[in-house]
């Protein structure tokens, strides 16, 4: 029997441009879902009771101890949806975000030194790691990064980004991968499904501006993805989405509401005891610089979802991190006429031609042209082996042409417009 935790709380971490403060609307979303399907309330209670029974049966003598069980490794595919070249974040940015996730879940980040002394005894190495996939659903080689240019300027929280039919990108099989979509969400920082939702919607959506280390004030260290990954693994907000609510974790103090900004010292609410609120927990909405721990209780709750009968269990036998069975190479009849792309004529007056017959893997990628000042001028989608671009409207001068591919290959050419 397969036990499901249905996606009832899509967690919206909303960052106001005016106040630079994240505000969550998950409670309103939950109320609407329960109104649409009242029977879900009973179903949630039954499933949560099963989780609590499972947790009781596990060893709880873990406080303050390093992780000693097997490390869970989660295959990740990152879908990058971009409308402009500036939104097409680099592979390095993706690697950076994966590093932040691993440091946070393994308690290896340097800012763990900022955890208050009175909470250090329950601060957990969760024994969970994230790795970019090496095999795609067809067992072909992959970098674990998908790039797709889209006509959509800004996405909402309606999950359209998760469907190619809506100009988004279809999810890879969620029984084998964690899907992360990166796109322009406007003022929204990110949101996540909970375990057990529809497989085609399962995963995390992160705003381009807060993915990896960025310039977004207050949320520039990649912690938004850490927060949303916590939701994806079954954690609630630390204040339980209501005044002094329940997050279903025993060792997190009761808290009156989310925490704004980056406080310090002891802040007490809900009779949280002499140590006060745990506003430095990743499941609060504190700014990135002030979040630095998951607790032992949160660790155990996340890891129980990988046990038999729970939806994340299939990830333990995923083929996503196995060596690919198929390594794609161009068919014989499409082998290159030469060993590198050709750009001609150069100089040019009204049209340039980029011949990419040397490698069909450039199909579907985007050509970007900038001027000598680095300003973006124009772009064109590669939909044939030979691409012609009209440059009649360009001012005379030197220009740079760039095409990037998921595997790190890059075409860089320069040309002169007469």
What do these predicted regions represent?
Residues 5, 33-41, 217-218, 335-337:
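Short hydrophobic "helix-edge" motifs at membrane interfaces and signal-peptide entry regions
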Residues 142-143:
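Phosphate-/polyanion-interacting regions in eukaryotic proteins
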Residues 1-29, 418:
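Bacterial Sec-dependent N-terminal signal peptides
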Residues 20-100, 104:
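Primarily auto-inhibitory N-terminal propeptides
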Residues 336-344, 348-418:
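C-terminal outer-membrane/trafficking sorting elements
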Residues 9, 13, 65, 119, ...:
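Residues embedded in well-ordered secondary-structure elements
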Residues 69-71, 123, 173, 347:
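Short, surface-exposed loop/turn motifs at beta-strand boundaries within globular domains
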Residues 76-86, 91-136, 147-226, 232-334:
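Extracellular (secreted or membrane-anchored) zinc-dependent metallopeptidases
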